[in-house]
From Swiss-Prot:
Task of the protein: Located at the top of the head of the 30S subunit, it contacts several helices of the 16S rRNA. In the 70S ribosome it contacts the 23S rRNA (bridge B1a) and protein L5 of the 50S subunit (bridge B1b), connecting the 2 subunits; these bridges are implicated in subunit movement. Contacts the tRNAs in the A and P-sites.
Keywords: Ribonucleoprotein, Ribosomal protein, RNA-binding, rRNA-binding, tRNA-binding
Signal is among the record's keywords: no
Oxidoreductase is among the record's keywords: no
GO BP: translation
Upper classification of the organism: Bacteria, Pseudomonadati, Thermomicrobiota, Thermomicrobia, Thermomicrobiales
InterPro entries per record: Rbsml_uS13_C (IPR027437), Ribosomal_uS13 (IPR001892), Ribosomal_uS13-like_H2TH (IPR010979), Ribosomal_uS13_bac-type (IPR019980), Ribosomal_uS13_CS (IPR018269)
Gene Ontology molecular function: rRNA binding; structural constituent of ribosome; tRNA binding
Family as reported in the entry's similarity comment: Belongs to the universal ribosomal protein uS13 family.
Source organism, top-level taxon: Bacteria
Gene Ontology CC annotations of this record: cytosol; small ribosomal subunit
Assembly mode: Part of the 30S ribosomal subunit. Forms a loose heterodimer with protein S19. Forms two bridges to the 50S subunit in the 70S ribosome.
Species in which this protein is naturally found: Thermomicrobium roseum (strain ATCC 27502 / DSM 5159 / P-2)
Protein name (Swiss-Prot/TrEMBL): Small ribosomal subunit protein uS13
Region (Disordered): 98-128
Length: 128
């Protein structure tokens, strides 16, 4: 199993798909990385040579922000928006959609489940 950027890539998958399992690398970026290293996208991870794995590791770890560093960067960006008190920061703080979506209806993923009002479970009645 090849280990790149702290992620174990599954041996039986194509390298093109396996690279997308690294946080911060999508389909397009994976294709560009493989093009730069000269590796065929249809190659399975188990068929990669040590030299090819090292070339991938060099490009990803030295030239890209991935995994924990990227997660930290995103979290810090959101924290900065909240700290400066801008509109987007307020939306993040209130747990509402940030990019202008409607909230009168929908937005349930961001707002969470509806509060349950006036719903009681039926229990045993006294005196029965």
């Amino acid at each position: 199993m090849a280990r790149i950027a702290g992620v174990d890539l599954p041996r039986d998958k194509r390298i093109e798909y396996a690279l997308t399992l690294i946080y911060g690398i999508g389909w397009t970026t994976a294709r560009k990385i493989l093009e730069r290293t000269g590796i065929d996208p249809w190659t399975k991870v188990r068929d990669l040579t040590d030299d090819e794995v090292q070339r991938l590791r060099d490009i990803i770890e030295k030239e890209m922000v991935v995994e924990g560093d990227l997660r930290r960067q995103v979290a810090m960006n959101i924290k900065r928006l909240i700290d400066i008190g801008c509109y987007r920061g307020l939306r993040h703080r209130m747990g509402l959609p940030v990019r202008g979506q409607r909230t009168r209806t929908n937005a349930r993923t961001r707002k969470g489940p509806r509060p349950r009002i006036g719903v009681k479970k039926k229990g045993k009645q006294a005196g029965s």
